């Protein structure tokens, strides 16, 4: 297995819902007019609380500096696990549960905080740039570590060090944050960038102007329904995470879906905003899923974390996580 350190230097930011009009000029450019910007990594996720933006340095320049833009105090690097060589775009997604033991748990054991972004194509593990020497040292026994430089994949220079580095004891990691599962059913999909103009106005509506208005056809007493939509444009590949009601607004022939048409249910992690310093949150969730061999997507946002699991597994997942939660008492 190879671990690729991508060349994007990323910022993670949050915009309050009511402040999004201040940023739509830049966000529309990043999402729909990529030829007009040098940005290669852009992700926008709307939750009930806010919009989370993950963007590279070039894309960050498209956003106005504003007191309404909260930015995490670090530059982040994206790591990508690739099986059998190639890049994320040409390989099959491995899934967050498959890297739980090899990547997520070892980093948690070393108190290295991670920020996850699963897309239709792959899973990105974001780590603080300043933590990279610890990351490479922790994972060098499991992976061939390669770095992308000017688009070429080269052997990573040995950033490792052993001074003060203690082999951790494997620890039990009970789930310590409150969990909830909205009633929405989600799909994870993509579309050909060439067809983006055909759905651009619809996407703009969904991203900025729908204001969480529920589909009138949806049950009006559905109080467990939340607003969640994620759009990523990374190295020319589009990924979309949306609920079924939103999906039904799109021409079906334009969206890629799995042959099984699989739908996903969400587990939201966190009662209070989680912050960026606590380690092991992703591991607490992904390790029980890995043990049960349940595939998952995982999307961290500025305030909360979100795991998506196959619809038919949701009750078992909630049970397994609740058992883990009980273990903390």
From Swiss-Prot:
GO terms for molecular function: identical protein binding. Keywords: Cytoplasm. It comes from the Eukaryota. Its main location: cytoplasm. Gene3D superfamilies: VC0802-like. Residues 72-140, 262-322 form the ACT domain. Belongs to the GATS family. This is Cytosolic arginine sensor for mTORC1 subunit 2. It comes from Mus musculus (Mouse).
């Amino acid at each position: 297995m190879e671990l690729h350190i991508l060349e994007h230097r990323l910022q993670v930011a949050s915009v309050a819902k009511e402040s999004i009009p201040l940023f739509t000029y830049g966000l529309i450019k990043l999402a729909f007019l990529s030829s007009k910007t040098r940005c290669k990594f852009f992700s926008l996720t709307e939750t009930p609380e806010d919009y989370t933006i993950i963007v590279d340095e070039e894309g960050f320049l498209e956003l106005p500096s504003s007191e309404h833009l909260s930015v995490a105090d670090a530059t982040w690097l994206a790591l990508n696990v690739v099986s059998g060589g190639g890049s994320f775009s040409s390989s099959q997604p491995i899934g967050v549960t498959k890297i739980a033991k090899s990547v997520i748990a070892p980093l948690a054991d070393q108190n290295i905080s991670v920020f996850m972004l699963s897309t239709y194509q792959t899973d990105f593990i974001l780590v603080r740039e300043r933590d990279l020497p610890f990351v490479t040292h922790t994972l060098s026994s499991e992976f061939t570590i390669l770095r992308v430089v000017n688009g070429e994949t080269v052997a990573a220079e040995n950033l490792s060090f052993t001074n003060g580095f203690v082999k951790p004891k494997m620890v039990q990691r009970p789930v310590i944050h409150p969990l909830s599962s909205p009633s929405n059913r989600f799909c994870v999909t993509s579309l050909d960038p060439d067809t983006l103009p055909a759905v651009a106005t619809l996407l703009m509506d969904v991203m900025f102007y729908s204001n969480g208005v529920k589909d009138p056809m949806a049950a009006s007493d559905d109080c467990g329904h939340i607003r969640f939509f994620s759009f990523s444009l990374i190295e020319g590949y589009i990924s979309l995470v949306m609920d079924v009601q939103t999906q039904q607004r799109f021409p079906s022939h334009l969206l890629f879906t799995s042959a099984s048409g699989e739908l996903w249910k969400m587990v939201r992690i966190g009662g209070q905003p989680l912050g960026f310093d606590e380690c092991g949150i992703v591991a607490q969730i992904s390790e029980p899923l890995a043990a049960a061999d349940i595939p998952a997507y995982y999307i961290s946002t500025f305030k909360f974390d979100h795991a998506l699991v196959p619809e038919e597994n949701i009750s078992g997942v909630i049970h397994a996580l609740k058992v883990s939660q009980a273990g903390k008492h």
